[in-house]
């Protein structure tokens, strides 16, 4: 049985400033490009049966710089849709909604999109996990995507509700490895850098 490797894209201007970034297609910063390239030695010798990326440029570029040959683009790997909070920091949101928490409240609709609840993001994560399940007996699977989405996917892989993704802080330009032990899913590595 292969492992599930989660690769968070390298740094962008908005990830550095703390702005919520879902559909805004920002490039990697020079530091983000460095982060992505430094992942190549961690991934070079893995027996990948499947490599999927988010459709957004920051994920596709991270995969390329990390030496991963993407076998497909999966729209379900896009980041949590932040709706009205796209481009806004948590600090700014708390000025008008002091008790707001993404993990319980989700994101409200905005002019550029509907926003998503934790449950909606969890359903996307479940679809991705179902799609990759058939490849895991043949080797490792890499998913190159985004912070909040990969945290939800981790929670779902471990059998937890989507909101428990809050427990897994995920840095830019890192690899996480989800494996199994005695037939049960486990976190084998988290926030690994070269």
Language-model segments: residues:
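Short, hydrophobic/glycine-enriched beta-strand segments
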Residues: 3-9, 143
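Loop-to-helix element that buttresses phosphate recognition and phosphoryl-transfer chemistry
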Residues: 8-62, 111-126
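Active-site signature of alpha/beta-hydrolase-fold catalytic machinery across serine-
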Residues: 65, 152, 156
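Internal catalytic-core helix/loop-beta-alpha segment
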Residues: 100-136
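Short basic (Lys/Arg) and small-residue
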Residues: 146
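Short active-site segment of divalent metal-dependent hydrolases/proteases
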Residues: 12, 149-150
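Phosphate-coordination/substrate-recognition cap region in phosphate-metabolizing enzymes
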Residues: 38-101
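Acidic, low-complexity terminal tails and accessory targeting/binding regions
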Residues: 1-2, 80-92, 134-140, 155-194
């Amino acid at each position: 049985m292969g492992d599930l490797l989660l690769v968070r894209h390298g740094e962008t201007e908005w990830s550095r400033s703390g702005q919520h970034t879902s559909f805004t297609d920002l490039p990697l910063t020079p530091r983000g490009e460095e982060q992505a390239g430094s992942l190549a030695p961690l991934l070079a010798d893995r027996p990948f049966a499947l490599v999927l990326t988010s459709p957004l440029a920051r994920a596709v570029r991270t995969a390329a710089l990390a030496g991963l040959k993407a076998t497909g683009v999966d729209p379900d790997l896009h980041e949590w849709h932040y709706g009205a909070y796209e481009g806004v920091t948590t600090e700014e949101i708390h000025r008008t909604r002091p008790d707001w928490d993404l993990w319980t409240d989700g994101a409200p609709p905005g002019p550029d999109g509907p926003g998503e609840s934790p449950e909606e993001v969890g359903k996307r994560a479940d679809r991705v996990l179902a799609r990759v399940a058939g490849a895991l007996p043949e080797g490792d699977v890499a998913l190159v995507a985004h912070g909040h989405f990969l945290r939800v996917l981790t929670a779902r892989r471990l059998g937890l509700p989507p909101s428990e993704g809050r427990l897994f802080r995920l840095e830019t330009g890192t690899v996480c490895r989800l494996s199994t032990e005695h037939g049960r899913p486990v976190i084998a590595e988290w926030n690994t850098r070269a």
